[in-house]
């Protein structure tokens, strides 16, 4: 995730990155990397609270180029596929699908069981995606 944010910073003139971090992602960052949450935040143009369901990315009128979910946990994948939007990540993904914007989901390692593959197929069928990037005006 941090590497992707660093790469996207090269295109600051045309891409503004917005970051939403789930509790699970916070735990993964802490347990599996040497990065702090503050270091992750430093690479995004704007950070949104995952529990603020009224934030800009939750609205179809909030114009974005698309969304990337990385890494995408099974819980998040199922939420996106089923349309269950109880947090900002899921709501933003739902809006991204509804508005037919570009979307990318990069599942975590180990999501290769049959049920997980079925959810990935559903997501591909829906033309799915999440970081959110917003077009600069």
Q: Which stretches of residues belong to each language-model region?
A:
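A cross-family phosphate/adenosyl-ligand binding-site feature
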Residues: 1-104, 108-137
């Amino acid at each position: 995730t941090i590497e992707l944010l660093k790469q996207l910073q090269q295109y600051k003139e045309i891409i503004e990155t917005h970051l939403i971090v789930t509790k699970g992602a916070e735990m993964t960052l802490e347990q599996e990397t040497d990065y702090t949450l503050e270091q992750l935040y430093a690479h995004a143009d704007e950070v949104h609270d995952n529990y603020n369901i009224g934030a800009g990315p939750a609205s179809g009128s909030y114009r974005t180029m698309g969304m990337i979910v990385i890494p995408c946990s099974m819980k998040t994948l199922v939420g996106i596929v089923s349309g269950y939007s109880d947090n900002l990540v899921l709501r933003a993904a739902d809006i991204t699908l509804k508005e037919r914007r570009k979307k990318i989901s990069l599942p975590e390692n180990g999501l290769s069981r049959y049920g997980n593959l079925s959810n990935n197929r559903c997501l591909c069928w829906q033309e799915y995606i999440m970081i959110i990037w917003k077009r600069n005006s």
